[in-house]
Amino acid sequence: MLSTAGEWLRGEGPHHQVVISSRVRLARNLRDRAFPGWAKKAERTSILEQIRSHVEALPEMQDAFSEGLQDLAALDKQVLVERHLISREHAAKGAGSAVVVNRRQTLSIMINEEDHLRMQSIRSGLQLKQAFKLVDKIDTALESKLDFAFDPRLGYLTACPTNVGTGMRASAMLHLPGLVLSELINQVIQAVSKIGLAVRGLYGEGTEAMGNLFQISNQTTLGEKEEDIINRLSKVIETIIDKEHDARQTLLQRKPSTLFDQIGRAYGVLTYAHAMPSKEALNLLSVIKLGMDLGAFPEDQRLQIDELFIDTQPAHLQKSSQQKLNAEERDYLRAQIIRDRLKIFPKPDISKMVTESGNGLTNGPPSNE
């Protein structure tokens, strides 16, 4: 499983030009058992044994990848983090914790992370309702076998008070280069925060928004139905999608030379560089992805770029090379992989991009002479 890309990365979902993925996660705990952070090793192991067999028996988990955290190499754990299949916190766990992932990598269940169970469904594009439908089905199936901690007044009980209630965290990963280049992103983040939603970086809380990638999610779950949370978040994301498209078109109409220059420079550096730090690679790939969305590159090359966002991450580089690499070695290998992938990648077709924008320019950037 670790050698193949997840189905959600194929970029085939609704609004895939802006929404990379949608994820819905449910947190559950067993009644009258200590939370993982408070439980001793023997109790965590007992809880794991109680839960794991039921998870593996799910029809959706036929031929699943199922491993105890103590049996996974540190590198494999980090690969799972980079694919958003486990959290950074779960990767730090050992005996008494496990992960079960379906072969399509659209369903992931962490056992004994912060809670006894963290079930998540990932979909390409804006598909929060579909992601919730699957994880809700899994939750119902497991609840018929396990006694979950539930309070009639509060809802599902969780280790973190902010998850008490539905135990649900819904989020979408958005690619927002237009808003960043237009210097409007801070306004959007402030507006989103004021209505009770959280904005985080590439790998969640406390991480940087590299590659112009932002996670938007609900912050609290108490006193609100799952469907209401999903609907409210979906509407906000649809508004952000509109603002991102508006920002891209405004850049194309008012600052075409700047936009063409950014895309050309990104293509040039990625095509010829021999050392490439992770952050720089993500930021440049983001510009190429923007160029593709605007028509500068053929659509049939999209998967190649989307896969590079994952394949050039530190653990994936070491996994593919089958050796441990220091930061400098990773930078050289990252640049080599990008150069090799872009050998058959066409040069940016600026005239096509401008024509598709419908702003009347047909011969590339205006002359400065």
Please annotate each region the language model reported.
Residues 176-181:
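Short, surface-exposed ligand-recognition loops at beta-strand->loop->(often short) alpha-helix junctions
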Residues 155-174:
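Conserved phosphate/anionic-ligand binding catalytic regions in large, soluble enzymes, centered on
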Residues 1-153, 168, 182, 187-369:
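Long, Pro/Ser/Thr-rich low-complexity/intrinsically disordered regulatory tracts in eukaryotic proteins
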